[in-house]
Amino acid sequence: MGNIVAVIPAAGMGSRMGTEVKKQYLKLQDRPILAHTIDALEQVPDITGIVLVVSPGEETLCQELILKGNLFNKIMAVVPGGDHRQTSVYHGLCSLPGDTELVVIHDGARPLVQRAEISHIIKEARRVGAAALAVPVKDTVKLVNDQGYVIATPNREKLWAVQTPQVFNYELILKAHQDAREKGVYATDDCALVEALGQPVKLVQGSYENIKITTPEDMVMAQAFLKRRNCWCE
């Protein structure tokens, strides 16, 4: 079997956070969010390497704020991203060695994912080719038109909120991205690109704590979750 490499897109602007510092560099209990995220992936024995994708021109900043002073052993490269998350992920994919078997794509702003969840999703992806963490939605979801009027209410029992990591066979996800680029298709997650090829994607239930930190409210929740974990460990 080949290598399993993680790609962490961390090139987002973080405008909804409303801070001068980009969200991935904000401190979560005295460490940058991105450092927590890297640490979670470093702890997974199956993952042999990690590629960080940052905003163009921020490679040195990432070295100073994230990598310097942290004992990370699996960082393979820090590469510049693009204008969209999808482009950034593609840049990361193109930097991977040819003997890569599986790719673990994980948002830089999801620092609370746990080792067992990552290991589980890797196992499923190895079996079926594409798998992602997700949780059943708690609220009723409405489909609306451009004017804000409800046009449908999907069955909540069939709706899941997709998270990351999303893990794929390397050749499959690379082909999915290349196909999307040729067709000018943009999606909000990588699973959608694989789905467009007609390939099945397996969802595995994760944790509601695996939030993507996007707003100040998310930061408060992340602090609370992390504090509770630390209390359990003491």
UniProtKB/Swiss-Prot annotation:
Catalyzes the formation of 4-diphosphocytidyl-2-C-methyl-D-erythritol from CTP and 2-C-methyl-D-erythritol 4-phosphate (MEP). Its EC number is 2.7.7.60. Belongs to the IspD/TarI cytidylyltransferase family. IspD subfamily. The record marks R16, K23 as: Transition state stabilizer. It comes from Desulforamulus reducens (strain ATCC BAA-1160 / DSM 100696 / MI-1) (Desulfotomaculum reducens). GO terms for molecular function: 2-C-methyl-D-erythritol 4-phosphate cytidylyltransferase activity. One of its GO terms (biological process) is isopentenyl diphosphate biosynthetic process, methylerythritol 4-phosphate pathway. It catalyses: 2-C-methyl-D-erythritol 4-phosphate + CTP + H(+) = 4-CDP-2-C-methyl-D-erythritol + diphosphate. It is an enzyme of class 2 (transferase). Transmembrane segments: none annotated. The keyword Nucleotidyltransferase applies. InterPro entries: IspD, IspD/TarI, IspD/TarI_cytidylyltransf_bact, ISPD_synthase_CS, Nucleotide-diphossugar_trans. The record marks R156, K212 as: Positions MEP for the nucleophilic attack. It comes from the Bacteria. This is 2-C-methyl-D-erythritol 4-phosphate cytidylyltransferase. The gene is ispD. Pfam families: IspD. Pathway: Isoprenoid biosynthesis; isopentenyl diphosphate biosynthesis via DXP pathway; isopentenyl diphosphate from 1-deoxy-D-xylulose 5-phosphate: step 2/6. Keywords: Isoprene biosynthesis, Nucleotidyltransferase, Transferase.
